[in-house]
């Protein structure tokens, strides 16, 4: 019997496994406090409300049938209303497509808009899931540095003036993954104006926009241009296992995505989409739930930053923690975080090294820390362990 493995498609040659997904397998030990994953806290997932929604939906036998490729109509209507309020312009339900998490939306948009070799501009450092998608699409990925107020649109403008012609610009506009920063209003306006001037699409990835601590973020980039595809998700505000994400885009893009989705999965889960509809439409409950999540994550973010300053002083810098799930840490003494990670794991703490998000030595001394998944006492212990590991590494 011939047991040799058949050759795989060449498109996989340039695709790397997500360092974060690989790291999660290493950190699944009970003795490790993980600051590595981007997981919401299980204790803050509204399990009882999800159970009630499931019971209500399952009372109708039709809830377990196939559905429309573009998603459950009532959910699209609810999301269109929410987006209309955010963007301060009318969004129709036909401009919304429901996907199997926002990662599928990212994949389908890349398939719809990118030919092989198309230029895609990304943040540096960048969301690793986006880098994977664009690599699979055989895109020519061009990083633009991210600053304290988002993508450096001045640098982007300079490169555009020098002849760069991207098809797509991807950015995480609110509480960036991994940098933790939020794009300023002026940067948003500038990026939108550049898209209009040079004719590229903006992919505004926004899974964290609802998780603000003190003040909401500025209006979305899509408020200033219709050359924007917005992505978001119920994973961070309701539950990852629902696998409900969505995109908001002009109808021609939505129709192209729907066509591709037909071939990908026919349709999503009508069961979980109906459950999500019920919860997202219940504005009184949802506002109270989001306020609980914001308050708890805000407390954790402040606690992590406080413990970090106490432990490391001016030997390390942290990004601001105004929302989302992450802070970006940089050692001032040149510590290589990739080399530090094995020692940190020996001490029972995990993080994601900066080089996982950018192939650039500038980020070798940085790391992404997630404060959302662990209660405050565990965060304090995680910093203590990290300090001990760092002391031995020096």
Where are these regions (language model features)?
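Short hydrophobic/aromatic beta-strand micro-patches
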Residues: 248, 328-330, 370-372
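Conserved core of the PLP fold type I
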Residues: 59-198, 209-229, 297, 377, ...
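N-terminal small-domain helix-loop-helix segment of the aminotransferase-like
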Residues: 11-101, 108, 282-284, 288, ...
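Conserved glycine-rich beta-strand-loop-beta hairpin in the small C-terminal domain of fold type I
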Residues: 294-305, 317-330
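Conserved core segment of the aminotransferase class I/II
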Residues: 229-294
